[in-house]
């Protein structure tokens, strides 16, 4: 259908309000500024100046200018700027950043309301004016863009329509900051050379307080984000100078802000122990599939056109037949040539399509570079570039997401081409979120491999950072500014700087004098102390980054079988736990619950539905009573003090309760008969195999209870420990078949204090169990309780567990006691999360677990000390309670151990001898008591030994010794530096002498033999050696 047939159809209209809508894509303001820098880079500019010009009559008080020396634009190129979405850079093989034809408009409109562009190319000077102020003042809905052009030499207008040119210039003079033609020409003269572009943005966006969003006052050398605190904000989020320094992975353009050069960085050259890993994957297909679809569409259209042209040529040839007139032959030849041309184009498009289809199946390869940022360890994470342009920064992956010190300070760098991942329009994210997550997951796996390869964890993470001056425990604190630490950091990371003339990167040799040196903005190759790289003609040396290998942990068949067995066992335990529990989510579920009642005669009151008031908690003397006489009272954490409640004479039912964590259940208090003691059960389902303790609550804390205990034995109540690990209290009272979970008011309040932040909703769980009515013996209960106590002592042990043929450190967080085995639950300090869970159940005493050395006393936590203090206070509190409540203390009496320990004289003598040896070994040289006198002291004399003076003199002597070592080391370092300088001076003198000698030899040879041609030192050496050989 001809285009003329479409002339009556509706067309999409672009209103000037779209200019604002389009600009909202830039949430990050520096991203809008970077769009204008990207345009200069794509125009092959070698320099861009970003500066502000004060204009108090404009909104914001200044204009923001971007001046580059790129290729510039002619009138046709400038006209394409105002076509939204049109870009000449959009080709599959393009390495340019711009792809969408939208950056200039969206970026400039995000910064201000209006912008004016001046550009020069060849003999033309073009001005482009895009103003929302003009549209608002004139009440125009459509987007109108004045675009006048002048001749660069004569400054005469270049136009076919003088009236149109006059209207365009009149609008510029009226609504732009430049009111006359002379002022406009002055802006053109700011563009150096024959080509370049100047973009000026004015009427800037303001904040709610009326100030501009960009701050150019706080730092005259920088453009900063207004009202952004430096604390907790990455430098690149606050300073445009810092953001521009890392904007490109391989900077080849000088960036000046307010006339001061930005020291751009190649991140891989700024890291300690960089290492590269090659990553290959077939998962990145979205962009490649789009390219294949485009190529197939283009190839299909080209094929149809070629077939149609060939068909026309054949038809014309048949129709002409034997007509051999000149006009007929010319017409036939033209049609045939067109058919041949279209066929060639179709074949080319077909080959492109086939190549893209093959490329779709080929895996994509990326290079991950990791290194440690020893200059600022808190600035870590992944920097992800697209076609050398920064898209995402400080992305945490792999072990960094866990928040520990593992992989802390490590920076990763990757450059992703367009065919792998496509960025969003604002160039602050990637369009395909699924493939981007896959990239981050792969980087996390390689990051864990890098951390293992550099072996920082094996040497000690804290020790490593101390070596570079990170002396504070606060991770975000900067390193020490002492000279020795600065030198240590400078020795590991050589200075890499860009020449201001040739734009090549040079790595400078390490010199002590350059540790705190500031290099000038106009640094050039001739300033390089390296003689091989001290001229711009020398080729740029590529950074030599070691190549790492990503190794997946290969499991043996036995390990796979063992892991599978462990998973099956865990799932079975979860299934059994679910089968034994009934979740209560509503009152209807509670009514359906089958609760068994006891087989007592009906002399007691029947079970009632209405709830009664909760009974008071048990007295502390009963709760803390030991399970056997020789046992010590169980310590209670100092953070949980509790008072002994007053015991009422009315018999009430005691209840114990515990609350689960994240996926835990709340406890249900079922209706019960009054004055009827019940067995209590507290069950926690947060672990697959909770600990078991036996409780005999058959005696209530009331001496007037009408019900008597049939057993004449002394009843012992086991201690219920309050630990973070889940516990389970199982009844041991005879003639009871009913087990229900009820709540204890006091313990529920304590649990709520500890867990109110994590547990908001839960569910009731009632555990139904059936026990034989046979009476359980007290001795069996005591043995189980003792075994459980001994097992509980294992909690907190530091152990090593073998996983996949490697040992990992961890801590015992839970203990499970079985019939014939004790199992530990070990939480690892760090393991690769892709192959090993964060914790694991192991059998105590097996080959896969071993104990670590206990920590030193000074590292004991405050909680341990508080528990120790509680142990001392416990007996006193219990005695006080026993005095206040004689009836209860008669039922459960705690007999103190009054047997005195016999003195072992041999042990005392041995300890005295050990003390003598220690004092003699560390005796200061000038101490008034000699070693001989010390050896003759008895135990009474040692008690009065002046330890304070002893320690003082020892510390003074040790300090003097350290100072002498330090002074000797400093003198040696100075001597070594002086020797090094002397050697370097002698080396330079020798090289100069050698060079003069070679020059003289060449001059001598040229006098002897005029046609000799020697250009390099190597040729001279070879020629002399050849002469000596021939002479022999």
Swiss-Prot record:
Give the residue ranges for region: Disordered.
530-563, 577-793, 850-870
Catalysed reaction(s)? ATP + H2O = ADP + phosphate + H(+)
Q: Check the record and name the InterPro entries matching this protein.
A: Chromo_MORC2_6th (IPR056360), HATPase_C_sf (IPR036890), Morc_S5 (IPR041006), Znf_CW (IPR011124)
Where does the chain bind Mg(2+)?
39
Which consequence is recorded for altering residue 319 to E?
Answer: No effect on HUSH-dependent gene silencing
Q: Does the keyword Nucleus belong to this entry?
A: yes
Q: Which residues form a coiled coil?
A: 282-362, 547-584, 741-761, 966-1016
Residues annotated as carrying Phosphothreonine in the record are 582, 733
Impact upon substituting residue 344 to E: No effect on HUSH-dependent gene silencing
Result, substituting residue 358 to E: No effect on HUSH-dependent gene silencing
Variant or mutagenesis effect after changing residue 424 to R:
Found in early-onset spinal muscular atrophy-like disease with cerebellar atrophy, cerebellar ataxia and diaphragmatic paralysis; likely pathogenic; increased ATPase activity; increased rate of dimer assembly and disassembly; decreased HUSH-dependent gene silencing
- Composition-biased stretches, type Low complexity, lie in 690-704, 711-720
The impact of changing residue 351 to E is: No effect on HUSH-dependent gene silencing
Task: Quote the EC number.
Answer: 3.6.1.-
Protein origin, superkingdom: Eukaryota
| Record's function text | Essential for epigenetic silencing by the HUSH (human silencing hub) complex. Recruited by HUSH to target site in heterochromatin, the ATPase activity and homodimerization are critical for HUSH-mediated silencing. Represses germ cell-related genes and L1 retrotransposons in collaboration with SETDB1 and the HUSH complex, the silencing is dependent of repressive epigenetic modifications, such as H3K9me3 mark. Silencing events often occur within introns of transcriptionally active genes, and lead to the down-regulation of host gene expression.
For this entry, the protein name equals ATPase MORC2
């Amino acid at each position: 259908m001809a285009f003329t047939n479409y002339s009556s159809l509706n067309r999409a209209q672009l209103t000037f309000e779209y200019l604002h809508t389009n600009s909202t894509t830039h949430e990050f303001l520096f991203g809008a500024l970077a769009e204008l820098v990207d345009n200069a880079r794509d125009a092959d500019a070698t320099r861009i100046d970003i500066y502000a010009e004060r204009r108090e009559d404009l909104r914001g008080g200044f204009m923001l200018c971007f001046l580059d020396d790129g290729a510039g634009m002619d009138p046709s190129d400038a006209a394409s700027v105002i076509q939204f979405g049109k870009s000449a850079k959009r080709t599959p093989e393009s390495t340019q950043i711009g792809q969408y034809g939208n950056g200039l408009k969206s970026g400039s409109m995000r910064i201000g309301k209006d912008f004016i562009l001046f550009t020069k190319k060849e003999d033309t000077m073009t001005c482009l004016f895009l103003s929302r102020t003009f549209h608002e003042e004139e009440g125009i809905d459509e987007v109108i863009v004045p675009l006048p052009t002048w001749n660069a030499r004569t400054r005469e207008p270049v136009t076919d329509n003088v009236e149109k040119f006059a209207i365009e210039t009149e609008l510029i003079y009226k609504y732009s900051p430049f009111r006359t033609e002379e002022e406009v020409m002055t802006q053109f003269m700011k563009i150096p050379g024959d080509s370049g572009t100047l973009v000026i943005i004015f009427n800037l966006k303001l904040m709610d307080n009326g100030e501009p969003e960009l701050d150019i006052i706080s730092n005259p050398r920088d453009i900063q984000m207004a009202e952004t605190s430096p604390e907790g904000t990455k430098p690149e989020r606050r300073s445009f100078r810092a953001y521009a320094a890392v904007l490109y992975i391989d900077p080849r353009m000088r960036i000046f802000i307010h006339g001061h050069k930005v020291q751009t960085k190649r991140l891989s050259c700024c890291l300690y122990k960089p290492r590269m890993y090659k990553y290959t994957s077939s998962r990145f297909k979205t962009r490649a599939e789009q390219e294949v679809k485009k190529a197939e569409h283009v190839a299909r259209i080209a094929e149809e056109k070629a077939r149609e042209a060939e068909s026309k040529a054949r038809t014309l040839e048949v129709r002409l037949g034997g007509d051999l007139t000149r006009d007929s032959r010319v017409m036939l030849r033209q049609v045939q040539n067109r058919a041949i041309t279209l066929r060639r184009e179709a074949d080319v498009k077909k080959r492109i399509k086939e190549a893209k289809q093959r490329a779709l199946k080929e895996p994509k390869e990326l290079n991950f570079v990791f290194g440690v940022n020893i200059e600022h360890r808190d600035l870590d994470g992944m920097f992800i570039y697209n076609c050398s342009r920064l898209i995402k920064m400080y992305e945490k992956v792999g072990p960094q997401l866990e928040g520990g010190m593992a992989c802390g300070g490590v920076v990763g760098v990757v450059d992703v081409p367009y065919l792998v991942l496509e960025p969003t329009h604002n160039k602050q994210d990637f369009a395909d979120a699924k493939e981007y997550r896959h990239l981050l997951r792969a980087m996390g796996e390689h990051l864990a491999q890098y951390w293992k390869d550099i072996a920082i964890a094996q040497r000690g993470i804290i020790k490593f950072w101390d070596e570079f001056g990170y002396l504070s425990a606060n991770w975000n604190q900067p390193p020490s500014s002492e000279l020795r630490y600065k030198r240590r950091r400078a020795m590991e990371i050589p200075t890499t700087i860009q020449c201001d003339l040739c734009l090549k990167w040079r790595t400078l040799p390490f010199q002590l004098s350059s540790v705190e040196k500031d290099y000038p903005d106009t640094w050039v190759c001739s300033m390089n102390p390296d003689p091989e790289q001290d001229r711009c003609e020398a080729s740029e040396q590529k950074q030599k980054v070691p190549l790492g290998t990503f190794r997946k942990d290969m499991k043996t068949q036995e390990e796979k079988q063992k892991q599978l067995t462990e998973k099956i066992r865990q799932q079975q335990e979860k299934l059994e736990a679910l089968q034994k529990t009934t979740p209560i989510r509503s009152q209807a579920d509670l009514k359906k619950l089958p609760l068994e009642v006891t087989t007592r005669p009906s002399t007691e009151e029947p079970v009632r539905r209405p709830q009664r008031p909760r009974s008071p908690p048990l007295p502390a003397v009963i709760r803390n009573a030991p399970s056997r006489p020789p046992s010590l009272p169980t310590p209670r954490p100092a953070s949980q003090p509790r008072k002994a409640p007053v015991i009422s004479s009315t018999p009430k039912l005691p209840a114990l309760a515990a609350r689960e964590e994240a996926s835990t259940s709340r406890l249900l208090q079922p209706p019960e008969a009054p004055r009827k003691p019940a067995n209590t059960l507290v069950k926690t389902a947060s672990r697959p195999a909770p600990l078991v303790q036996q409780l005999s609550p058959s005696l209530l804390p009331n001496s007037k209870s009408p019900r008597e205990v049939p057993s004449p034995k002394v009843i012992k109540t086991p201690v219920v420990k309050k630990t973070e690990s889940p516990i389970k209290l199982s009844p041991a009272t005879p003639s009871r078949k009913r087990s229900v979970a009820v709540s204890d008011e006091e313990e529920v309040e304590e649990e709520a204090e500890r867990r109110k932040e994590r547990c908001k909703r839960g569910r009731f769980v009632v555990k139904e169990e059936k026990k034989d009515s046979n009476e359980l013996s007290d001795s069996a209960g005591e043995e189980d309780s003792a075994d459980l106590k001994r097992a509980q002592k294992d909690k907190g042990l530091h152990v090593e567990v073998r996983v996949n043929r490697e040992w990992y450190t961890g801590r015992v967080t839970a203990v499970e006691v079985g019939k014939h085995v004790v199992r530990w639950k070990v939480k690892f300090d760090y393991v690769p999360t892709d192959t090993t869970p964060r914790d694991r159940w192991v059998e105590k005493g097996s080959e896969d677990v071993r104990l670590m050395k206990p920590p030193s006393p000074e590292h004991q936590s405050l909680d341990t000390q508080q528990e120790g203090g509680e142990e001392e206070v416990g007996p006193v509190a219990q005695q006080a309670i026993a005095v206040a409540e004689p009836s209860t203390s008669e039922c459960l009496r705690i007999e103190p151990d009054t047997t005195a320990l016999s003195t072992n004289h041999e042990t005392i003598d041995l300890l005295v001898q050990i003390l003598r040896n220690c004092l003699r070994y560390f005796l200061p040289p000038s101490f008034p008591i000699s070693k001989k006198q010390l050896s003759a002291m008895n135990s009474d004399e040692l008690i009065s030994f002046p330890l304070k003076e002893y320690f003082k003199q020892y510390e003074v002597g040790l300090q003097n010794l350290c100072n002498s070592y330090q002074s000797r080391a400093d003198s040696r370092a100075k001597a070594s530096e002086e020797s090094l300088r002397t050697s370097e001076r002698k080396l330079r003198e020798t090289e100069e002498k050698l060079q003069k000698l070679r020059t003289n030899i060449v001059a001598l040879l040229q006098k002897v033999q005029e046609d000799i041609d020697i250009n390099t030192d190597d040729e001279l050496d070879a020629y002399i050696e050849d002469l000596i050989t021939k002479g022999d």
